C-alpha cells in the first residue's frame, strides 16, 4: 500500500475532533509530535466546527453546528459528563466563566478553590494555584507578539495600603502569568469603570480582551481593549449606536 503524502495526512488530521486526536497520539511517534507543533494547532483551531456549552441545573450540553457553510446546517446536541467539572456542586452560582481558544476558565470570589482551567471536550480540569485566593478574574489572553503562547489572567485583588496606615481595602488591578505563577500589579485609569465593565461581559480574541464600556456622562459606547503584549488598556473604537438597554453584550464569531 502506497502511503499518503505527508501534507495530505497532516491536512486530514487537522480536521478531526480533539477527542480523536487524543486517541491517535499512541498510533505513532510522528503523529504524537505533530499534535504539539504550533502550525498544526493553529490549523486545527481554524478548521474547528463552532461549538457551544449550554448549562442547566441538571445537565451540561455540547451544541455543535454541522454544515454551517451550507444551505441546511444541522445542530448536534449531546450531554457532557459532569463529573469533575469545576464548581458543579455550586450549580455555577457566583461563578465567572471566561473563554479563550476553546478553553474555559472558572472562578468564584466566594470559594477558596481559586481558578480552574477547564477543557470541556477532553474532560480535563487543572486548578491554577496562586497564593492569594482573593484574586477576582476579569478575563484572559496572551502576548500575541511571542511565538510561545503563555496564558495570562487579568483581574484584581483587594489590598490594604502598603504602609499599613489604614484597614480600608482597595482594588488593585493585576495580571497573573500562568507559566511563572507570578502576579504583576498594573495601573489603570478610571479603574472603577474598568473593573465593572470588563468583569460583566468580555471577549478574548487573538490574545487581547475586548468589552463594551459606556463613556461617562454621555449615552455613547465604545469597545475597550486590554492588550496583553503591552499590558495596557486602550480604546478600540467608538460604537455608532447609543445606549438603549440595561444589558449590552459583545460577542465574536469564528474568531472575527
Curated annotation (Swiss-Prot):
Coiled coil: none
Xref: Gene3D superfamilies: 1.20.1280.50
Short name of any one Pfam family annotated for the protein: F-box
Residue stretches making up the F-box domain: 1-44
Stored SMART domains: FBOX (SM00256)
PROSITE patterns per UniProt: FBOX
Domain of life: Eukaryota
UniProt cross-references to PANTHER family, sorted A to Z: BNACNNG10540D PROTEIN, F-BOX PROTEIN CPR30-LIKE
Protein name as annotated: Putative F-box protein At3g51171
Organism of derivation: Arabidopsis thaliana
Lineage, top ranks: Eukaryota, Viridiplantae, Streptophyta, Embryophyta, Tracheophyta
Amino acid at each position: 500500500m502506497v502511503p499518503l503524502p505527508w501534507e495530505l495526512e497532516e491536512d486530514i488530521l487537522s480536521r478531526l475532533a480533539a477527542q480523536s486526536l487524543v486517541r491517535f497520539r499512541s498510533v505513532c511517534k510522528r503523529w504524537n509530535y505533530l499534535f504539539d507543533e504550533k502550525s498544526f494547532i493553529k490549523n486545527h483551531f481554524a478548521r474547528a466546527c463552532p461549538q457551544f456549552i449550554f448549562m442547566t441545573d441538571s445537565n451540561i450540553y455540547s451544541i455543535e453546528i454541522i454544515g454551517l457553510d451550507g444551505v441546511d446546517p444541522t445542530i448536534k446536541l449531546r450531554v457532557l459528563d459532569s463529573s469533575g467539572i469545576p464548581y458543579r456542586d455550586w450549580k455555577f452560582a457566583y461563578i465567572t466563566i471566561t473563554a479563550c481558544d476553546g478553553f474555559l476558565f472558572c472562578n468564584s470570589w466566594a470559594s477558596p478553590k481559586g481558578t480552574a482551567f477547564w477543557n470541556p471536550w477532553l474532560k480535563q480540569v487543572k486548578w491554577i494555584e496562586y497564593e492569594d485566593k482573593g484574586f477576582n478574574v476579569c478575563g484572559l489572553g496572551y502576548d500575541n507578539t511571542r511565538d510561545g503562547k503563555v496564558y495570562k489572567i487579568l483581574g484584581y485583588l483587594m489590598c490594604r495600603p502598603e504602609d499599613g496606615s489604614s484597614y480600608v481595602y482597595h482594588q488593585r488591578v493585576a495580571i497573573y502569568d500562568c507559566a511563572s505563577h507570578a502576579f504583576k500589579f498594573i495601573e489603570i485609569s478610571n479603574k472603577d469603570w474598568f473593573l465593572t465593565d470588563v468583569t460583566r461581559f468580555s471577549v478574548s480574541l487573538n490574545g487581547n480582551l475586548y468589552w463594551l464600556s459606556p463613556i461617562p456622562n454621555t449615552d455613547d459606547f465604545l469597545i475597550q481593549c486590554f492588550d496583553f503584549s503591552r499590558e495596557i488598556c486602550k480604546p478600540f473604537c467608538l460604537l455608532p449606536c447609543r445606549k438603549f438597554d440595561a444589558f449590552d453584550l459583545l460577542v465574536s464569531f469564528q474568531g472575527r
